[in-house]
């Protein structure tokens, strides 16, 4: 398994995508080098932006070690679940999902269109920026993806197969404990820390 870095990600992309311009002005950056407002605040995967001036790509790799260097045991299959979820959503609402270019199961990497020309809405909304189409787009995305992946539309076997396929208790615990418990202190929450620790203990029993 290759471990991607800023130094080798361009060669990797060239080996996977035949449309990538070998002679272009190639630019590479790693998610996390920019501000939270530019990059978001993910801390699990290693993500790179690669551009040849014409194509703008996101290259995302799952590794055993989190980008944040946290003490987590990570599920290496999480990249495939994310890719599969995006693939399903792209089949339902293709205009609302980044283009999917490649999924490399051997190296646990997938490549998508980079849509960083868009702004992360939560930061913009906090500034009072309004988007007239946002509510309609969110409503259409939620309604369509929820309906067409539900038992109202799918036969029971297909629905249950999908439910089992996307179960990932390891990542769920990491997000619930890592994001909502260990990052919280009594100074920045109205919920008591004792209550949060009790919840963490409960989760360990499940």
Regions found by a protein language model. Give the residues of each.
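Conserved short submotifs of the Hanks-type protein kinase catalytic core
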Residues: 109-117
